[in-house]
Amino acid sequence: MSSKGEQPLVLWYNQLGMHDVDRVGGKNPSLGEMITNLSSLGVSVPNGFATTSYAFNLFLD
């Protein structure tokens, strides 16, 4: 995980929802919503993770 006061560098799709668009872009939260809402209905959604905008900004610095 991250140190106190820092934000995470990556988030698993099952941790994401549409409220996370500002942290991980648009497509990743959609995949998170699909995993959360459709996996139990038998829809196969591959698990994965998203790098955060915080991680991207650290990389640029």
From Swiss-Prot:
Top-level taxon in the UniProt lineage: Bacteria
Protein's GO biological process: gluconeogenesis
InterPro entries on file: ATP_grasp_subdomain_1, PEP_synth, PPDK_AMP/ATP-bd
Enzyme class: transferase
EC number: 2.7.9.2
Keywords of this entry: ATP-binding, Kinase, Magnesium, Metal-binding, Nucleotide-binding, Phosphoprotein, Transferase
GO molecular function, one term: ATP binding
Reaction it catalyzes: pyruvate + ATP + H2O = phosphoenolpyruvate + AMP + phosphate + 2 H(+)
Pathway: Carbohydrate biosynthesis; gluconeogenesis
Cofactor or coenzyme needed: Mg(2+)
Note: The reaction takes place in three steps, mediated by a phosphocarrier histidine residue located on the surface of the central domain. The two first partial reactions are catalyzed at an active site located on the N-terminal domain, and the third partial reaction is catalyzed at an active site located on the C-terminal domain. For catalytic turnover, the central domain swivels from the concave surface of the N-terminal domain to that of the C-terminal domain.
Notes concerning its domains: The N-terminal domain contains the ATP/Pi binding site, the central domain the pyrophosphate/phosphate carrier histidine, and the C-terminal domain the pyruvate binding site.
Role according to the record: Catalyzes the phosphorylation of pyruvate to phosphoenolpyruvate.
Protein family membership: Belongs to the PEP-utilizing enzyme family.
Protein name as annotated: Phosphoenolpyruvate synthase
